[in-house]
UniProtKB/Swiss-Prot annotation:
It comes from Rhipicephalus microplus (Cattle tick). Inhibits bovine trypsin and human plasma kallikrein, but not human neutrophil elastase. The record marks K16, G17 as: Reactive bond. One of its GO terms (cellular component) is extracellular region. GO terms for molecular function: serine-type endopeptidase inhibitor activity. This is Kunitz-type serine protease inhibitor D. The keyword Secreted applies. It is found in: Secreted. The lineage of its organism: Eukaryota, Metazoa, Ecdysozoa, Arthropoda, Chelicerata. Residues 1-17 form the BPTI/Kunitz inhibitor domain. Keywords: Protease inhibitor, Secreted, Serine protease inhibitor. It comes from the Eukaryota.
């Protein structure tokens, strides 16, 4: 439920790879 398009890669982690 987070905007992975705006959060850093460290926050997205598994979502951004």
């Amino acid at each position: 439920a987070v905007d992975f398009s705006k959060v850093p890669t460290a926050t997205a982690g598994p979502c951004k790879g």
